[in-house]
Amino acid sequence: MARRKSTVILVLLTLAVLLLSPWASAPAPTVKPASPSGGTEALPSASPVGEEPAELAVTAVVGMSEFETLQAQNEAFRLRHPDVSVELRRQDPAEAGRRWNGEEWSPDGADIWLVPNEWVAALAVAGELLPADEVFVGEAISEPFDSLVSQLKWNGYVWAVPRDMDPYVVVWNTEVLSALQAEGETKFSPPLSPEAWRELPGKLAETGLNAGWLAIDGSDPLALLAWIGLFANRREDAPLTSAGQASDGGALEQALSLLAEARSGIRSGPLTPAFWRSFAAGEAAAVVARNSAATRALRTLSGSEAAALAIDRSAWNRDFVWPGGVSIVLSAKTKHEEAARVWAAEMTSKDNQLQNYRQTGRLPVSRSLYSEAYGIVEALSDSGLRGFPNEPALASGPEVASRLAEIGALWSGLLDGSVAPERWKALATELFADFKRDR
């Protein structure tokens, strides 16, 4: 009996050893390191793309300063993602705009494009783009302002990732305006009423000041819409809707008439450093300029020159101004979708948005960056929920780009004399027809 018990015990011990030996030899589980902290957000230190080595071509319709910043950010991306090579190409915005308006624009076979927001819906309708919804994950879904995202939606999808914005402002020459009124008068104190705008050209001539009443980009229809919004004290896309025109008390017609009748007093050349010096010396009473251009100009002028000028952002208190944004879109023909999405996400990170702002003056698109902690002087965080930049665009469908091109051609024609004032008034009213918001 004892021998039988010993045999049973020996068999049981042998079975136990056989059962436990695989577990004893199994490797210990690997503990993943914690994500890095600090800064605005943590970016990956190694490539998460998960594809074969990818070669991306990027065409950027941006200015030289913006392109240089993009190049530096792209180099940092390539260090984090050694399996992804990226070739950057730049297209001058003015030349690209002319080619776009002539239906000759081409992205040169690129996988990714940086383009004006107004182009996005037209490119999506043409079947040129991949939806960008997958780039918006986590807090990125709610971060961009509605004024921007509304321009990038069509047919239920978001077709681009917003990178920056640069709305128009007006810069006043306060010395010129002060010379137009006696002490104690305020008619020509900015911002001007429609009546003061109408009287401004004649008042300048009456006082003998050799100054234009307005300096503005004669090639950009968004500059024109910015001034009309300033004149009428209305949202900048109101002239593009029948409802907006019906409720403006005839302000659109008054604005168009003033531009035609006083076009000889409009300065429409490029806003070069030489222009800003002459503007400070009394070349014009007011200039409509991009926010980044205005802030950069005042920084580069001497103290005495800059003292005569005042940037007026009060238009941003209205429901809507054109954001003037550039967004990243993904080509439907790319062979590296995942790598393209990762690049788009990282190029629009909060850290890169702040770098864009500090180096180029173009504003971030993320709500949470508008706090004192980040040093952004433009106080968009104080905007109401229904004001800019939180109000969707009324004109955001695929027809926007072509209609703006028509308005821009007519606007340029008025200023260079190829379009007579009477024809301008008739055609402009027709072109400012109703847009339908396609969200």
Per-segment meaning from a language model:
Residues 47, 63-85:
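Short, polar/charged alpha-helical segment
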Residues 51-65, 84-89, 112:
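Short, well-ordered beta-strand elements
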Residues 80-144, 180, 278, 285-286:
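Extracytoplasmic "Venus flytrap"/periplasmic binding protein-like
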Residues 115-169, 306-311:
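Hinge/lid segment of periplasmic solute-binding proteins
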Residues 199-201, 237-273:
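Glycine-centered hinge/linker elements that transmit conformational signals in sensory
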Residues 357-413, 437-438:
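Long, aromatic- and glycine/proline-rich binding clefts that accommodate carbohydrate-like moieties
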